[in-house]
């Protein structure tokens, strides 16, 4: 398994559009990858706690668990994600933070 997380800083005036766009564009990508056995689980989280807040933004944590590294590459090359990524860039202020790597321990997530 591989876990990838990204912290996005969405301008406060774009929060509704960002969340609606995420549902309309990224969620179908997640469903596609899950149906293909590449994605184990994923969440979009509005952050209430942050050690690196960005003024004028609402921060979101995107957390995705892929069955293998192949899933991560399939996600990033997915036409739906590529289109959404271009749209979502316009909503952001500040630089996103991205982290990822092999999942060492997990609980409550089926390991196919």
Predicted stretch roles:
Residues 29-34, 66-70, 86-91:
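Glycine-rich loops and low-complexity Gly/Arg-rich segments
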Residues 10, 29, 63, 99, ...:
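Generic detector of low-complexity/intrinsically disordered segments
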Residues 5-8, 16, 105:
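N-terminal non-cleavable signal-anchor helices
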Residues 14-44:
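Short amphipathic alpha-helical segments
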């Amino acid at each position: 398994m591989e876990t990838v997380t990204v912290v996005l800083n969405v301008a406060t005036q774009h929060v509704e559009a960002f969340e609606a766009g995420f549902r309309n564009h990224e969620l179908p990508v997640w469903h596609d990858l899950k149906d293909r056995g590449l994605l184990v689980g994923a969440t979009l989280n509005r952050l209430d706690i942050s050690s690196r807040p960005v003024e004028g933004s609402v921060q979101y944590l995107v957390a995705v668990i892929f069955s293998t590294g192949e899933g991560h590459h399939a996600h990033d090359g997915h036409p739906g994600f590529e289109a959404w990524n271009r749209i979502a860039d316009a909503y952001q202020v500040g630089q996103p933070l991205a982290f990822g790597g092999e999942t060492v321990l997990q609980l409550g997530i089926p390991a196919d």
